[in-house]
Amino acid sequence: MQTFLQVAHIDKICDNKCIKFGRSVMGFLSEYNSKLTSAEAAVKCVKSGDWVEYTSNLGFPAACDLALSKRRDELKGVKIRGDLIFGPIQVIECDPDMEHFVYNTWHCSGYERKMCDRGRAFFEPMVFRNLAWYYKNFLTSDVCMVTVSGMDDEGYFYFGPSLGMSKCIADNSKIVIVEVNRSIPRIKGSEEARIHISEVDYIVETGDPPLFEMPNPAPTETDVKIANLLLPYIKDGACVQLGIGGMPNALGELIADSDLKDLGMHTELCSDGYLAMFKAGKLTNAKKTLHNGKGVLGIAIGSHEFNEWLTDNPAYVGYPLSYVNDPYVISQNDNMVSINACIGADLYGQISSESSGTRQISGTGGQLDFVCGAQMSNGGKAFICMSSTHTDKSGVMHSRIVPTFSGDIITTPRSLAFYIATEYGVVNLAGLTTWERADAMISIAHPDFRDELIKAAEANRIWLPSNKR
């Protein structure tokens, strides 16, 4: 009965195209049903000591994860890689001592961060553009499990929001299991945006559960202040890369309400901020010097409306992160404007965007790639943004601009720092000396901490007596 229903469903999707493709479509249906199995049966291929891939965000294979966790007592030393998975992850939950499963992430979600904090997961440092290179040359991958869209009439499944890294992982895995969820938006573009049924070993039906929707945090007053400071730096026809969070969303809304026109998109992560710009008629991609007329993305996370916007939209196309995040590719977009956030910066211009001390908060992602690409772009600019302070659990306020880091992981080195922004202003560190950098960074620090930072700069011999106090 399951096989009959599946054939009927795909035949309905194919509609009259079955006539056009003749036996090939029926061949795909036959192959589909020959590979269709339960999650419990599919994960039987995993052996002790294997490396298993969970890919990224909405590509997380929830049914296979649950089925694999139930094999805990049969397995030892299975190592799993994932990325930005919003949890819970059952192979972590079922094995607190990590005797059977060891989970590793490329980029921490809130859930993965908590697991790392508890010593129940580990971080794997990398820049996203190198991921394909890692898999082709250095990494072992035994089993890839990934959630995909329903199969189309040509035998393809689409990776949708997780397309940026899924194909290279699947291509370099010995066994590929796909979980079909027809809620996954079909984001088209390069060949790496999809996988053919002939490349798949097992197919698991999920019942098409609703997709996780990224909450849109309301921008804070500080977010809005920073966004207002950045808006004048964006010109008509600029190609914009936005990160995720309150400030980028605030900037997207400001752009939507502005007089800007003909903006383009080339971004690692596409989210609802771009949808707001599109709905306001600001995002046309008409002036792009690379992929003219098309917005380019590597990963997507957003609302239901956002997913509907991207589905089968020929004007917004997906490419692997090895391409999207390549600084040379980024630089081919004239007037590239890259806007990302950080956790803190020091007086030398070093930027920490992924850790607090040695505690992993997120990941390197593509920030460094876009900073480099924007610098190489004709008319390009790269902005790293932060609030000037943060408040700890005890209610004590701390400056995000510090004299120098001690233990924090550096995401963007001082030699590549460009524009840095807080609610107190925007400074350009490109080409500045250490004393000029100290002066610039102190000028955008919270006023309550400026005297303290001046004393630290003097102690570190990066402060001129003639600098303004």
Predicted regions and their residues:
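Conserved alpha/beta enzyme-core scaffold
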Residues: 15-16, 21-469
